[in-house]
Design a protein with these regions (language model features):
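Peripheral (often C-terminal) accessory segments that flank ATP-dependent C-N-forming ligase machineries
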Residues: 14, 147, 331-435
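Active-site "cap" helix and flanking loop/linker of ATP-utilizing ligase/carboxylase catalytic domains
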Residues: 26-27, 269-289, 296, 306-368
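Local beta-strand N-terminus motif with an aromatic residue
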Residues: 35, 101, 183-184, 240
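Glycine-rich phosphate-binding loop signature in dinucleotide/nucleotide-binding domains
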Residues: 95-101, 174-182, 214
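A conserved helix-loop-beta module that forms one wall/lid of the active-site cleft
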Residues: 120-206
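Internal nucleotide-binding/catalytic subdomain
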Residues: 192, 199-300
Length: 435
């Protein structure tokens, strides 16, 4: 893929130049032509920097708006609209195959099925596209898990409000609720959105009316009481190479890695569940990000699984804690030319290899009207405070939070005590960052 000389770049394009990019500084790692050629599907500057510091050739496939940045920073780039689905969708797979690309790595949720479709062509394995659909459609995902003997809660699909009403009543009838007893909550989720997007907890029948018609169809699930956590597992040749347990402090707010000793005590049982997941979904390689619940009596329930980097900058947290690039790890296990020895040598020992505990907190304004960003002293004066990505508000009125909502930015922490980290992250919920 040809790189545009600086002399041919316009001032507008050059305004996008990042002097810290290895490709600009001249420090990019030489590429080994005997190793795989990676296509990164989607957009992540951190993933691009990781690719530049890795020994694999790479190319970025992202929307047209990324073109000037890529040109300015000497990044090999193919523009592609991932929202466009038509009879020309095969073009990108054909073009990447002609380019000599070996594998496509998805960087966000909307590129997972694209990676499946492209890899089915690059690797001549049609089943890979069907597998990617299982990772994108949460109803199909749950059914596949059930077929594999994985424990899940009660779930159904909702196409209209009345479906949710019936489901909520049926779940509570199953739980032998009597008249006057408070209902157990249920959850509704978008079929194909990442993380907390479109995720609502419904506690009363009246709350169902708050769901806009355009959000249907939805997946409905019974509420699982227990300890919710996430896993990031890198898989090569059908086997787990590295398994991180991410501990949620409050869902949608905070997470840290590695987990506390209490949650890590479940590692053997969690590993068995991940091995069952790999077998059930026939996963040969890649990075998976499943979520589970552990109940008080030790039962483990499957929530969902994603085939792309997690939200809340979990890859960056893992790199901070362990020292290896999680993006490079994904490129390594996706690459069909990687050897077992190379993969084994890349990863440190789980938990023991960590240099400390890395966590982050997603900030939501607690006030209806705000005028400025003001970092609380309780946050920035704490010895565990690392950095933040918050910016000044662009408007004074805070929009209503939809479902679990989308945070306004992340605050990062690093320290040597997981209990202090957990308590610190929890305490951030009582602070005002926007005033």
């Amino acid at each position: 893929m040809a790189i545009t000389p600086e002399s041919e770049m316009s001032p507008e394009v050059l305004s996008w130049r990042d002097p810290e990019m290895p490709s600009v500084k001249g420090t990019e790692k030489p590429k080994d032509p005997s190793k795989g050629y990676i296509a990164l599907l989607g957009w992540s500057v951190n993933a691009i920097k990781a690719a530049q510091n890795f020994d694999r050739r790479y190319i970025v496939v992202a929307p047209e708006w990324a073109a000037d940045f890529c040109t300015a920073n000497n990044i090999p780039f193919i523009p592609w609209d991932f929202l466009r689905l038509n009879d020309k969708s095969m073009e990108i797979a054909t073009r990447l195959k002609e380019e000599g690309v070996d594998v496509a790595v998805p960087l966000f949720e909307e590129t997972v099925e694209w990676s499946g479709a492209i890899n089915s062509v690059l690797m001549d394995s049609p089943r890979m596209f069907g597998q990617s659909i299982l990772f994108r459609d949460k109803a199909l995902m749950k059914r596949r898990a059930q077929l594999g003997g994985i424990r899940v809660g009660i779930f159904e699909e909702a196409h209209e409000k009345e479906d949710i009403v019936r489901f909520m009543k049926r779940v509570n009838q199953t739980l032998l609720k009597l008249d006057g007893d408070p209902d157990d909550p249920i959850h509704v989720k978008a079929f194909d959105k990442a993380g907390c997007l479109g995720h609502r907890m419904i506690r009363t029948l009246d709350e169902i009316d708050q769901i806009p018609d355009e959000e249907y169809p939805l997946l409905m699930e019974s509420h699982l009481s227990g300890w919710e956590f996430a896993v990031e597992a890198w898989i090569h040749d059908g086997k787990i190479q590295f398994l991180n347990i991410s501990e949620y402090v409050t869902l949608g707010y905070s997470v840290f890695v590695p987990a506390t000793r209490e949650l890590e005590s479940w590692r053997e049982a969690i590993t068995k569940q991940i091995e069952l997941l790999i077998k059930t979904f026939d996963i040969k390689f890649g990075l998976i990000h499943p979520e589970y619940f552990v109940t008080a009596d030790g039962e483990m329930y499957f929530g969902e699984v994603a085939y792309r980097p997690p939200g809340f900058k979990a890859f960056e947290l893992i790199e901070k804690a362990y020292g290896f690039s999680a993006y490079q790890a994904s490129m390594l296990v996706f690459d069909p030319k990687s050897t077992k020895e190379e993969v084994a040598a890349f990863f440190p020992k789980e938990v023991e290899g960590a240099k400390g505990y890395a966590g982050c907190f997603g900030v939501y304004p607690r006030r209806r009207v705000v005028s400025k960003l003001e970092m609380p002293k309780e946050c920035i004066d704490h010895p565990y405070f690392d950095y933040h990505e918050l910016v000044a508000p662009t408007e004074e009125t805070v929009p209503d939070r939809n479902a679990f909502g989308t945070h306004w930015g992340l605050v990062f922490f690093f320290g040597d005590d997981p209990i202090k980290m957990r308590d610190l992250l929890k305490s951030q919920e009582d602070l005002d960052f926007y005033v």
